[in-house]
Swiss-Prot record:
UniProt pathway: Amino-acid biosynthesis; L-leucine biosynthesis; L-leucine from 3-methyl-2-oxobutanoate: step 1/4
Protein name: 2-isopropylmalate synthase
Functional note: Catalyzes the condensation of the acetyl group of acetyl-CoA with 3-methyl-2-oxobutanoate (2-ketoisovalerate) to form 3-carboxy-3-hydroxy-4-methylpentanoate (2-isopropylmalate).
Entry-linked SMART domains: LeuA_dimer (SM00917)
GO terms under biological process: L-leucine biosynthetic process
SUPFAM superfamilies: 2-isopropylmalate synthase LeuA, allosteric (dimerisation) domain (SSF110921), Aldolase (SSF51569)
Similarity remark: Belongs to the alpha-IPM synthase/homocitrate synthase family. LeuA type 1 subfamily.
Documented EC number(s): 2.3.3.13
Superkingdom as given in the UniProt entry: Bacteria
Region (Regulatory domain): 398-524
Gene: leuA
Alphabetized UniProt keyword annotations: Amino-acid biosynthesis, Branched-chain amino acid biosynthesis, Cytoplasm, Leucine biosynthesis, Manganese, Metal-binding, Transferase
């Protein structure tokens, strides 16, 4: 957050594109409810601009952007659009309910993109820049234009396009490092030279959008700001296409911790960063790497004796920020089988969750069941319970019961009962091991041709009674769907995770039946 002594000139707008560029990451597809949940969290956290999706891509994307626009209280709601007029008009319709809406239109400007992707001459691209921005400006005063693959674009042509876009009404100019090719010094110089060369550059805010292909997305983002950009486009956990995007939590904390070298400020409530990371991880079923900066499990862990000794004497010996600054409060052992509804509600609020009365009741029932099986219920256990309720509460296929017979000799056999859209089904199946038997049972109960791409297990907490958290990724018709589930029984968690991915496939198929939009390429 900021103080009254900080100038508006040094403010950096945080533009979150988790719901658009982040969701383009293979396997990271989110359901409608998951998108609403993530958007609400971003809005509460102080994100200035939420790029909520690509309305022309599908009816599902349109509906999500439209609903987020209706519900947002603080953030500008932005929709992405190609340079085509029909895309822009659809985007305008999607963001219409927003108190403050933005249209973000883009066009490739690099020689390789113009020749092979657009198959257009530079003169045609130049005219389309003017046409698209003008069209968008007819709908809203807040228009962003992106020169896709700006870092591989000829400088003179880039400046001409930027000047034309600003003259046509663009209020934000984004120069994305689409393929993660730039290095910090040249990216800083690009912004400095563009702002120095383009005669009307003072009429627009400049923006960075960096991909992490060479591991320099955050460094490049900060370099762009040093060169004069005042908007950073980023995603929670750095998710995105290929190697991902600049991570929101990293750019925000870089500005917070290194004010001596990065004298800029933003409006993000940093104590929500860890919760935001976990929310997006749960929605996408993408685990956060243990050594991830700021929000990783080991970000504030110290194992070596020398480090521990230093921490005991003075935390500043090995910590450049406090865990509390980013919302890490440490694991607590206060919850158990004697805890009541009020205690659970308080704990969930402490962890950053806001649930409806029905959702609270469902979580409480499962919490009591877990507490009967587990001596201590950690914060991570409660987060797993809540995430499962939020992500799988509306599933059409639900696990009712599971029995597995396994041993060193003889067949591994699973018996399962499912509720499939209100219909109870029971089946028994064998497999090459208990997990294989469980998955074969699901295939027998719900016939499908999805292929298993990933099966991963790790413990939510420590100890032999820890919940197992299982991630499953299924591939179907060229799309990957990932789901995650937790349970003290690894096989139950495995079944729930598999069913979670299958439910996403079912939901996607149902949306596809209703949709009749062409497949479209999106900006990076």
């Amino acid at each position: 957050m900021t103080t009254t002594t900080q100038s508006e000139q040094d403010r950096v707008i945080i533009f979150d594109t988790t719901l658009r560029d982040g969701e383009q990451c293979p396997g990271a597809t989110m359901t409608f409810e998951e998108k609403l949940n993530v958007a609400r969290m971003l809005d509460d956290m102080g994100v200035d601009v939420i790029e909520a999706g690509y309305p022309f891509a599908s009816d599902g994307d349109f509906e999500a952007v439209h609903e987020i626009a209706k519900r947002s209280k603080n953030s500008v709601i932005c929709g992405l659009s190609r340079a085509a007029h029909k895309d822009i008009d659809r985007c305008a319709e999607a963001i219409k309910p927003a108190e403050r809406g933005r249209i973000h239109t883009f066009l490739s400007t690099s020689p390789v993109h113009m020749k092979y992707k657009l198959q257009m001459e530079a003169a045609q691209v130049y005219e389309m820049v003017i046409s698209s921005v003008t069209r968008a400006r007819n709908h809203t005063d807040d228009v962003e234009w992106s020169a896709e693959d700006a870092t591989r674009t000829e400088f003179d042509f880039l400046c001409r396009c930027i000047e034309a876009a600003i003259k046509a009404g663009a209020t934000t100019i984004n120069l994305p490092d689409t393929v993660g090719y730039a290095v910090p010094e040249e990216y800083r110089e690009l912004f400095r030279k563009v702002r120095e060369t383009v005669p009307n550059s003072d009429k627009a805010r400049f923006s960075v959008h960096c991909h992490n292909d060479l591991g320099m997305a955050v460094a490049n983002s900060m370099a762009g700001v040093a060169g004069g950009a005042r908007q950073i486009e980023c995603t929670i956990n750095g998710i995105g296409e290929r190697a991902g995007n600049a991570a929101l939590e990293e750019v925000v904390m870089a500005m917070r911790v290194r004010q001596d070298k990065l004298p800029y400020w933003n409006r993000i409530e940093t104590t929500m960063l860890t919760h935001a990371s976990k929310t997006v991880s749960a929605a996408t079923s993408f685990p956060v790497q243990y050594n991830k900066a700021i929000v990783g499990r080991n970000a504030f862990a110290h194992e070596s004796g020398i480090h521990q000794d230093g921490m005991i004497k003075n935390a500043q010996t090995y910590e450049i920020m406090t865990p509390e600054t980013v919302g890490v409060k440490g694991t607590s052992l206060v919850m158990g089988k004697h805890s009541g509804r009020a205690g659970l509600i308080h704990k969930m609020e402490e962890l950053g969750y806001k649930l409806s009365r029905n959702q609270i009741e469902d979580v409480f029932v499962r919490f009591k069941a877990l507490a009967d099986r587990k001596k201590d219920v950690y914060d991570e256990d409660i987060e797993a319970l809540v995430d499962e309720q939020l992500l799988h509460g509306q599933d059409q296929i639900k696990l009712m019961s599971l029995t597995v017979i396994a041993g060193t000799h003889g067949p591994q056999r699973a018996t399962m009962k499912l509720d499939v859209d209100g219909q109870i089904r029971i089946e028994e199946a064998e497999g090459n091991g208990p997990v294989d038997a469980v998955f074969n049972c699901i295939k027998a109960l719900v016939p499908h041709d999805a292929k298993l791409e990933l099966y991963q297990v790790h413990a939510v907490t420590e100890g032999t009674d820890a919940q197992a958290e299982v991630s499953v990724r299924l591939s179907h018709e060229g799309r990957s769907m990932t789901a995650r589930a937790a349970d003290p029984d690894t096989l139950v968690a495995s079944a729930k995770a598999y069913l979670g991915a299958l439910n996403k496939i079912v939901a996607k198929r149902q949306r596809s039946v209703r949709e009749d939009a062409p497949t479209v390429a999106v900006a990076g």
